[in-house]
Regions:
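Glycosyltransferase specificity loop/lid
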Residues: 1-472
Length: 472
């Protein structure tokens, strides 16, 4: 029977895309394995793979009940899909030599299913080692206090391998231990520690110190840490996609033609992922900052949430049919048309970052965006919004020096026009911190290229985990 590896991502496009890249990588370098990826029927935004090395199995699913928080939905879908998954894995095991199941954190409900079938389970951590350190240390933090992180406010948490992290900067779903989401995350962290191994979308050169601390067991002081395999960066190979999703087209996006006419490394790109929405007031402030900076820019703008009281971001799709111009200062588009372009909702992020005219990136610090930027050698300004992005920001700014920070209002986490103008200008033209960041990101890019090359650290890690599966 053919040696088979099954991948089971949660129904989030970014997770599916990254898991597909892992499957392609396995199929390319270890063709002895048959790769099957199981997708829930809820994966409506799932990209299509034409890789001959990957078999896609669509799993029927039972709709989960409405969740109080948006981020609970992937957990709930996996929990309500366990019986279907059990049948699918049993069917695969009856005709193939099933060596391992690879899941992500949101599909954690699959862990006991695989254990009952005697299938070794590996977690694929789609973010970086900095966020992984937080997740692995959560059970320890949970046992050290009875308070929720939201009640600890700006109290500093000491997580091995990371700069000091404010309790308020922990991933959003961890803020209140009374939330169902918190319980799901805590269970996922505990299961991850008990798994056969953790595959991470990073590389040794980018996060060497944090990876070393994790491997030494400092994040999990009371139990053995599972084997860690840094196999990244895994960047979407179909370059007309981005981390945030969106419709793609065979026709070249107009923003790329505009970039063709701009000087080398002169344009700052602003893009905030699929859920990054700002209030109308913040959009106007951002526009004013870009105008004051005098820097060339390409700005992807999503309409603000319909709830005018929203102060920062929302995952809502409401308002997508609204004109962007109404949220800009009067005359802004006309005054900046010679040096700026505003794109509604979506742009081909990987192609933009890889364009020779782009010299900077204002990002929400989503991990896919970070590794895409570093892989392209583009320095960043960090503007974290949700999920684990504040942890990623701490790594980018304080540890790796690959991004400049933004000062935010204590009241509503807004950024002033002057602050954005100052940091964008420093990133693109500055001789101080901006120059350091520009130089550091080019060095980090070289490290990534080396890690992915034959004999590089990521290839060695992939071979190491594959060797475990071969031994079975």
């Amino acid at each position: 029977m053919k040696e088979t590896i099954v991948l089971y991502p949660s129904p989030l496009r970014g997770h599916i895309v990254s898991m597909l890249e892992l499957g392609r990588l396995l199929g390319k370098h270890h063709p002895r394995f048959s790769i099957i990826i199981i997708l829930s029927s809820a994966s409506t935004a799932a990209p299509v793979t034409n890789s001959s090395s990957i078999t896609v199995l669509h799993l029927s699913s039972t709709a989960a009940p409405a969740a109080a928080e948006l981020d609970q939905t992937p957990f709930d879908l996996a929990r309500h899909n366990t019986s279907n998954l059990r049948l699918a894995l049993a069917a695969i095991a009856s005709t193939a030599d099933l060596r391992a199941l690879i899941i992500d954190g949101f599909s954690d409900a699959a862990f006991p299913v695989a254990a009952a079938l005697g299938v070794p389970t590996y977690y694929y951590f789609t973010s970086g080692a900095a966020a992984l350190a937080v997740f692995l240390h959560l059970p320890t933090l949970h046992g050290s206090t009875t308070k929720s992180f939201k009640d600890l406010g700006d109290e500093t948490l000491n997580i091995p391998g990371l700069p000091p992290i404010k309790a308020s900067d922990m991933p959003w779903g961890m803020h209140d231990r009374s939330w169902r989401m918190y319980g799901y995350l805590l269970d996922a962290c505990r299961n991850m520690i008990s798994s056969s191994g953790i595959i991470v979308n990073t590389c040794e050169s980018l996060e060497s110190r944090i990876i070393r601390v994790i491997k030494e067991g400092l994040c999990v002081p009371d139990r053995p840490t599972p084997p860690i395999f840094a196999v990244g960066p895994l960047v979407e190979s179909k370059v007309d996609g981005d981390e945030g999703g969106g419709d793609t087209t065979e026709r070249r996006h107009e923003c790329l033609s505009w970039l063709d006419s701009q000087p080398s490394r002169s344009v700052v790109f602003l893009c905030f992922g699929s859920q990054g929405r700002f209030s109308a007031a913040q959009l106007k402030e951002m526009a004013s900052g870009l105008e004051r900076s005098g820097v060339r820019f390409l700005w992807v703008v999503r309409p603000p949430p319909q709830d005018a009281s929203a102060k920062s971001t929302s995952g809502s799709n409401d308002g997508d049919d609204t004109s962007i111009e109404k949220f800009m200062p009067e005359g802004f588009l006309e005054r900046t048309r010679e040096r700026g372009m505003v794109v509604k909702s979506w742009a081909p992020q990987i192609q933009v970052l890889s364009h020779q005219s782009v010299g900077g990136f204002v990002t929400h610090c989503g991990w896919n965006s970070i590794i895409e930027a570093v892989h392209a050698g583009v320095p960043m300004v960090a503007w974290p919004l949700y999920a684990e992005q504040k942890v990623n920001r701490a790594f980018l700014v304080e540890d790796a020096a690959l991004a400049l920070p933004l000062s935010m209002s204590d009241e509503d986490r807004s950024v002033s026009a002057d602050e954005l103008a100052k940091q964008v200008t420093e990133l693109m033209e500055g001789s101080g911190e901006g120059k350091v960041v520009r130089e550091r990101v080019l060095a980090a890019r070289e490290g990534m290229v080396e890690a992915l090359s034959d004999g590089g650290s990521s290839q060695v890690s992939l071979a190491a985990v594959a060797a475990l599966w071969k031994r079975g």
